[in-house]
Each structure stands twice: as C-alpha cells, then as structure tokens.
C-alpha cells in the first residue's frame, strides 16, 4: 500500500507521477497534481503542445498519448536533483506509435512539489521530434 500523498517527499511524489505515466495510469498521475497545477511545455506558439496547460488540457494530452501509443510510452528517469520543494529530472521516453514509428525523446523537467502534490511542472524536450510523432498525422 502506498503511503498517503502528503507523507511522500518531493522526489517520491515525482517518481510516483512518472511511474504512473509510464504505466498508463493517467488518472493516478493527474491525482498527484494540485487542483490548480500548471504544466508548461517548451515551444509555446510553435507547436500544438507548447505553452501552459491546466489539468483539463493535460488530460487531453494523456488521451492522445494513449491513443497514439497503445502499448504505452515508457519514461525512464536517468537522474534526479532535489533542493527543497524543487525537483529536477533528466529522463528519456520510448514508445512505439500505432503505425510502428518509434518515439524516443530526452527531457528535462523542473517540478515544484508542495504538501505532497505537484504544483508546477516545466518540460523541456526536442519539440521537432515530439511534434512529428505526437501531433502530425500518422501513416
């Protein structure tokens, strides 16, 4: 049984969030975010996913990922640095899209955790590769 969310430290909250994402447990991942949490993705104004997202638009992104990657999109955490409520994560994703194309991207996340919930998440990634595999039409 998992400890209550508020008893988890910032690193444990972040690791649990990305474990949920990797396992396709998107509702569980969203539950680890504060109700007013924001996510910012690099590339605002330059591709459809760039910019700020609330929980509703993040849910739409999760639905799109589930549709495009029916066998899941695995996220592997390579390194974590924690300073107070700030958690920096280096990670890599891997997934095979429904049409057989492979998506593998590198990320840096900067995450703020307060009271056991993620309040702010900033995502840096290769936006060209992400747009091609996440947003462009499938073959």
Give the predicted meaning of each segment.
Residues 1-32, 138-139:
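Short, low-complexity N-terminal intrinsically disordered segments enriched in polar/charged residues
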Residues 14-17, 29-30, 37, 58, ...:
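Hydrophobic pocket/interface hotspot
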Residues 1-6, 63-139:
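A beta-strand edge to alpha-helix "cap/lid" segment located at domain peripheries
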Residues 14, 18, 59-65, 134:
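A generic alpha-helix structural signal
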């Amino acid at each position: 049984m998992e400890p209550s969310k508020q008893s988890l430290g910032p690193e444990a909250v972040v690791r649990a969030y990305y474990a949920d994402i990797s396992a396709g447990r998107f509702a569980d991942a969203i539950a680890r975010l504060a109700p007013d949490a924001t996510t910012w993705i690099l590339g605002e104004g330059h591709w459809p996913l760039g910019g700020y997202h609330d929980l509703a638009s993040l849910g739409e992104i999760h639905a799109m990922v589930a549709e495009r990657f029916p066998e899941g999109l695995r996220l592997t955490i390579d390194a974590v640095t924690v300073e107070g409520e700030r958690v920096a994560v280096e990670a890599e994703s891997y997934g095979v899209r429904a049409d057989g194309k492979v998506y593998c991207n590198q990320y840096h996340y900067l995450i703020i955790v307060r009271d056991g919930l993620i309040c702010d998440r900033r995502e840096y990634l290769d936006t060209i590769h992400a747009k091609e595999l996440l947003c462009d039409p499938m073959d």
